[in-house]
Amino acid sequence: MGKIIGIDLGTTNSCVSILENGNVKVLENAEGARTTPSIIAYANDGEILVGQSAKRQAVTNPHNTLYAVKRLIGRRFDEDVVQKDIQMVPYKIVKADNNDAWVEVNGQKMAPPQISAEVLKKMKKTAEDYLGEPVTEAVITVPAYFNDSQRQATKDAGRIAGLDVKRIINEPTAAALAYGMDKAKGDHTVIVYDLGGGTFDVSVIEIAEVDGEHQFEVLATNGDTFLGGEDFDIRLIDYLVDEFKKETGMNLKGDPLAMQRLKEAAEKAKIELSSSQQTDVNLPYITADATGPKHLNVKISRSKLESLVEDLVQRTIEPCRTALKDAGIDVSKIDDVILVGGQTRMPLVQKTVAEFFGKEPRKDVNPDEAVAMGAAIQGAVLAGDVKDVLLLDVSPLTLGIETMGGVMTALIEKNTTIPTKKSQVFSTADDNQSAVTIHVLQGERKQAAQNKSLGKFDLAEIPPAPRGVPQIEVTFDIDANGILHVSAKDKATGKQQSIVIKANSGLSEEEIQQMVRDAEANAEEDRKFEELATARNQGDQLVHATRKMLTEAGDKATADEKEAIEKAIGELEVAVKGDDKAAIEAKMNALSEATTPLAQKMYAEQPQGAAQPGAEESKDAADDVVDAEFEEVKENK
């Protein structure tokens, strides 16, 4: 059996690695580099260039040079993130017949997996050149927050490249594997902060040592599949374009050739500013007008770059907070922070991470190579060459089906360790129902319509029976690649239907985050509504009690007192109709203050032991409250 190679298929760069004689080795490509740019170019003569050679000719062939294609993999053309990308890249992103986002090169439409396959072929060839034998099997990494369709599309890319993809694993998990192989003994919890070229991921991973075996369990994962180094480059490009426009009045955005040169220069400047305080972007003959050629020369300081991208760095912190919360772990319990991805070399990123986690991140893991190394280790585990590592990954979102009343019934909760299988028995909603539709959903909301539809299928020929009698067993099975298989079986007849959730369309990161945020916001809204309702009820009670007191007081209340109380009652009645809890409480306090002099006067004139006006009212109200609570307790029993 040949080697199972490990491939990090990155947005900006890719890397291939193998495990040899117990050691992980990152392989150099034909150009002698350990990483290969994930860039593919289609030359006019039909030649396909991959990697450094494609990058070198990008300036002269911008429309047919494809980069950051991973950002399109498994996505619909209409998604906001794709529409945003169309504005940023010089090549053409088009709508496929199935509504997916594809690219067009020399008049030919191509799917993102086809293009990514060219990079995988180069990785495969690099490994074959080193090993001197054919390579047919691989472990490929994906961002932890990639959804079902994005994972499927990555597997398809492997198949197109002639590789049997034995396992798709999450990039942060792979990085932790690379880091954990030579770790000291004992248990520890690590954070993997992975800010790559196009995606951001954070994972909380527990590495336990059980009888000499390293067990890697992902406790929680979070991220943003549309935030990475490319976005940092774009900020710098926009700044350079603006500076040039201020100086010359010319806008470079309409010139693909100039923009391609700017992209290269911005990336180079960004890298330089990680080690130096200032750099020059000098691009002679960037464009020309009637007066002659124009040159771009802009000085950029590190602090200027940091001010341009500060909000992007801050955007990575919220997913870190969510991942810790989902894992149920306090930040103080984290033993190590591992940085992965070239963008983590930026001093501002390192400083922000250190401040949030309260400890310096580790620098001994190469951020560009760790993921591929981990993939090679997992490949060796699958091949049986490594026996003391067990990897337990998680599903990033809740999965379930639509049930009666448009409710989503969850079968597999988010952050469940995979592979996993879960079955539940459902029944029919109507008498003599002969078929049921199984509607598979992904998301965190209770209402089915507010979650993402992954697919539907029908289970037909159910024998006639009263509603609630047939037993339909629905099984959800997530394999080790995070890909979902759903089946439904009529227990009476044994008839079965199933579906593999294919790469028809995926959830965008925005949609995922929106679902979680919506669910949290709804819980908060419900709490606020309850508090508002309570305040309104208290306000109404106070108005009623005060009016009763005024009636009982009769002539004892002076005209001024009556006027002040009536005014306060009117203001409270207006507030109770509104939605501002604080305003209701303020007007209640104002009414209480307005009634205090009259209440004191009436209290002083009462015979000893007599009840205060309004007290009976309060007592009745209090009795009601106790009754209600008591009844509720009985119901719960």
From Swiss-Prot:
Induction of synthesis: By stress conditions e.g. heat shock.
GO terms, molecular function: ATP binding; ATP-dependent protein folding chaperone; unfolded protein binding
The protein's name: Chaperone protein DnaK
TM region positions: none
Record-listed Phosphothreonine modification sites: 199
The protein's role, per its UniProt record: Acts as a chaperone.
UniProt similarity note: Belongs to the heat shock protein 70 family.
Biased composition (Low complexity): 605-615
Organism expressing this protein natively: Ectopseudomonas mendocina (strain ymp)
InterPro entries, per database record: ATPase_NBD (IPR043129), Chaperone_DnaK (IPR012725), Heat_shock_70_CS (IPR018181), HSP70_C_sf (IPR029048), HSP70_peptide-bd_sf (IPR029047), Hsp_70_fam (IPR013126)
CDD domains the UniProt entry points to: ASKHA_NBD_HSP70_DnaK-like (cd10234)
